């Protein structure tokens, strides 16, 4: 098998930067090797567990919290915060595979997991999830909102949005982290990007979310558009290959085929009581003013308490 290479590029595409994607070694281990248990676990828990592709590592998400799968010196490791250390919940044989790691994290080598029985990964992940649930203390997080919106948009409709990634950072840009990144169909049948910002309950950032965050994220995607296009062309291909997405033909438009207004910004206020905040100096009132200040160069929408991301819904 070929090793150490990401997806192939055309001559014109080589000038652009692919900032997320897995090389052939990582893909092999997921499909046929020691990491295959991750895909099996995802298939059994699609409604609450997500796998996202990074730059030659993975983030596994549950209730908004990430567990990393990283490679170091040819070995693969499961890593997370000490808050979610599963050691005390594991049987005696598995306790010994949990090791300390830098930056206040623990880690487990997949080589050690492989030496145990076939249910070892399931037991480890179940224990981590129990620790996350205990940490949340029953309180819904913005991460739960992300799961809900992601699951409801895995399949794209005529006017819908396909969510393709979450917690998107363009390396070195210093322009923040996009909650969710999606694709929408243009009139010509091709696709372009949508940035989604989720606000849970009465987050003070709501007041300036359009001019502070939505504008910044749209500018980032537009400025680095071809890097985003090349990256997610490959990420979509890899997700489909790994069974993380159903097959779908998304021809992402070139930058010269779109305008900045084609890149839509969507704000979702979730778990939000409108009546409670219905006052002149309330967050919603200030957000509406901020929305107006965005101007005509940007295309933005606001959704309240909905899991239906569709251009026919609510505010336009």
Language-model segments: what does each one mean?
Residues 4-316:
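Charged, terminal alpha-helix-loop-beta segments
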């Amino acid at each position: 098998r070929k090793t150490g290479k990401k997806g192939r590029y055309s001559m014109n595409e080589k000038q652009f930067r692919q900032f997320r994607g897995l090389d052939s070694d990582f893909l092999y281990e997921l499909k046929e090797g020691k990491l295959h248990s991750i895909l099996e676990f995802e298939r059994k828990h699609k409604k609450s567990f997500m796998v996202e592709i990074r730059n030659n590592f993975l983030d596994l998400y549950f209730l908004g919290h990430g567990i990393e799968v990283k490679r170091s010196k040819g070995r693969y490791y499961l890593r997370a915060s000490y808050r979610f250390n599963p050691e005390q919940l594991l049987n005696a044989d598995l306790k010994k595979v949990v090791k300390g790691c830098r930056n206040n994290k623990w880690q487990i080598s997949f080589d050690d997991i492989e030496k145990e029985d076939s249910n070892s990964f399931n037991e480890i992940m179940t224990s981590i999830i129990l620790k996350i649930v205990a940490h949340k203390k029953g309180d819904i997080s913005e991460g739960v909102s992300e799961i809900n919106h992601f699951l409801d948009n895995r399949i794209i409709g005529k006017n819908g949005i396909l969510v393709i990634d979450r917690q998107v950072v363009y390396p070195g840009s210093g322009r923040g982290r996009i909650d969710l990144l999606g694709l929408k169909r243009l009139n010509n049948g091709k696709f372009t990007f949508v940035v989604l910002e989720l606000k849970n309950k009465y987050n003070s950032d709501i007041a300036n979310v359009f001019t502070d965050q939505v504008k910044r994220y749209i500018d980032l995607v537009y400025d680095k558009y071809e890097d985003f296009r090349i990256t997610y062309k490959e990420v979509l291909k890899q997700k489909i290959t790994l069974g993380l997405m159903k097959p779908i033909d998304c021809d992402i438009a070139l930058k010269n085929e779109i305008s900045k207004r084609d890149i839509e910004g969507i704000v979702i206020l979730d778990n939000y009581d409108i009546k409670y905040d219905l006052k002149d100096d309330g967050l919603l009132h200030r957000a509406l003013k901020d929305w107006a200040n965005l101007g005509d160069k940007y295309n933005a929408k606001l959704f309240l308490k909905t899991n239906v991301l569709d251009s026919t819904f609510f505010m336009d």
